[in-house]
């Protein structure tokens, strides 16, 4: 009878040891899952940049200023986003054209407002390829 009791106690100790090992394994697995989700979250952050932010990284300071001006001009729903879908080179040339036209209106706020209205009208249906020809300021 003593031998059976001793064997039974040994069996319980072994069984208890196996269960505690499973707990450690579960904790390790949950820790790995948590680490993976944290890594995924940090990897997703760079992808969340908007088209505007990605474009701004490639623009000069003058071009950024013109982009801000254009953003205030294109107030219609989705018009500025539609503008950002164009090719980067076309966007840069449009921003340079805006700069030259606004420089013509130096100190003439009425001319700048007229040009802003012209730009709004152009982007309501115009193609960016014709922007430099069709959107011009009236001030000299």
UniProtKB/Swiss-Prot annotation:
Intrachain disulfide bonds: none
Pfam families, per the entry: Mlp
UniProt-annotated stretches for the region Disordered: 22-57
Biased composition (Basic and acidic residues): 33-57
Top-level taxon of the source organism: Bacteria
Topology in the lipid bilayer: Lipid-anchor
Tagged with keyword Zinc: no
Magnesium as UniProt keyword: no
Swiss-Prot/TrEMBL keywords: Cell outer membrane, Lipoprotein, Membrane, Palmitate, Plasmid, Signal
Gene Ontology CC: one annotated term: cell outer membrane
Lipidation (S-diacylglycerol cysteine): 18
Physiological role: An outer membrane protein that may participate in pathogenesis. Some human Lyme disease patients have antibodies against this protein. The Mlp proteins probably undergo intragenic recombination, generating new alleles.
Family indicated by similarity: Belongs to the Multicopy lipoprotein (Mlp) family.
Name under which the protein is recorded: Lipoprotein MlpG
Organism of origin: Borreliella burgdorferi (strain ATCC 35210 / DSM 4680 / CIP 102532 / B31) (Borrelia burgdorferi)
């Amino acid at each position: 009878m003593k031998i059976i009791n001793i064997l039974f106690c040994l069996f319980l100790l072994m069984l208890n040891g196996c269960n505690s090992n499973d707990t450690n394994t579960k904790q390790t697995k949950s820790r790995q899952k948590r680490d993976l989700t944290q890594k995924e979250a940090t990897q997703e952050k760079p992808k969340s940049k908007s088209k505007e932010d990605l474009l701004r990284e490639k623009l000069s300071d003058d071009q950024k200023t013109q982009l801000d001006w254009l953003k205030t001009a294109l107030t219609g729903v989705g018009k500025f986003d539609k503008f950002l879908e164009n090719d980067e080179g076309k966007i840069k040339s449009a921003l340079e054209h805006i700069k030259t036209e606004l420089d013509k209106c130096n100190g003439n706020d009425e001319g700048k407002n007229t040009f802003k209205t012209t730009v709004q009208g152009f982007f309501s249906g115009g193609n960016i390829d014709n922007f430099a020809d069709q959107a011009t300021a009236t001030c000299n």
